[in-house]
């Protein structure tokens, strides 16, 4: 409450009529929308699947509850503390560069899981996982704003959130069975290449639209 009281928020801007809204399918087929939505669902999905499986894997490996709780605490800090400067970094280097960095951090979590199953290995992997989520999901959300006009905002954001959080729900349900059948290292071996898919999508977008994709004027 104190932070809210001391924070100056600009007054809401009046939305100007920018013409009729395009069909939803036309919005979804834009390369920039594909990249933004794919990055969001991959970043959130990979993070949620690994995070949800972590307590199960650590319990199976013989770690006690305190170790599991501390691991998740470090992970949550890595998810949200960078938010204080993620926007600044995104403005400086661009959303696409931040997405690449986030994907590499997510892949780093998957790689580290193959190398170390020690307590500190779990700490490091979950910290990388949290940072990777922050550096993919937040820039992807910003990138999404390049894909719609003011009159299309609600539908475009609703479609994106449906895709992202449907993935989150599925990964939460799949975490237990996948960890039980594949193990911690095997699960992360599957997640590692998935974490790199947004980078491939960015390369595809670059070929489709050029380096500087045209932005929608609001």
Task: Outline where the language-model segments fall.
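C-terminal membrane-cytosol helix-exit motif in multi-pass small-molecule transporters
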Residues: 1-14, 201-206
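Short amphipathic helix-loop junctions that connect adjacent transmembrane helices
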Residues: 52-71
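Pair of pore-lining "gating" transmembrane helices in MFS-fold secondary transporters
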Residues: 29-50, 127
């Amino acid at each position: 409450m104190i932070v809210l009281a001391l924070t100056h928020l600009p007054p809401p801007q009046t939305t100007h009529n920018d013409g009729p809204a395009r069909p939803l399918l036309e919005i979804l087929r834009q390369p920039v929308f594909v990249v933004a939505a794919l990055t969001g669902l991959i970043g959130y999905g990979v993070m949620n699947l690994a995070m949800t499986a972590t307590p199960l894997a650590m319990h199976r490996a013989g770690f006690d509850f305190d170790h599991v709780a501390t691991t998740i605490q470090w992970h949550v800090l890595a998810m949200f503390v960078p938010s204080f400067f993620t926007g600044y970094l995104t403005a400086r280097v661009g959303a696409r560069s931040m997405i690449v960095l986030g994907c590499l951090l997510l892949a780093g979590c998957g790689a580290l899981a193959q190398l170390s199953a020690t307590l500190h290995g779990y700490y490091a992997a979950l910290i990388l996982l949290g940072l990777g989520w922050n550096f993919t999901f937040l820039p992807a959300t910003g990138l999404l704003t390049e894909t719609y006009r003011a009159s299309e905002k609600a539908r475009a954001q609703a479609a994106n959130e449906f895709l992202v959080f449907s993935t989150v729900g599925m990964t939460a349900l799949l975490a237990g069975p996948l960890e039980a059948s594949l193990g911690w290292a095997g699960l992360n071996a599957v997640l590692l290449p998935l974490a790199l898919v947004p980078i491939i999508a960015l390369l595809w977008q670059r070929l489709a639209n050029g380096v500087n994709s045209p932005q929608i004027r609001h």
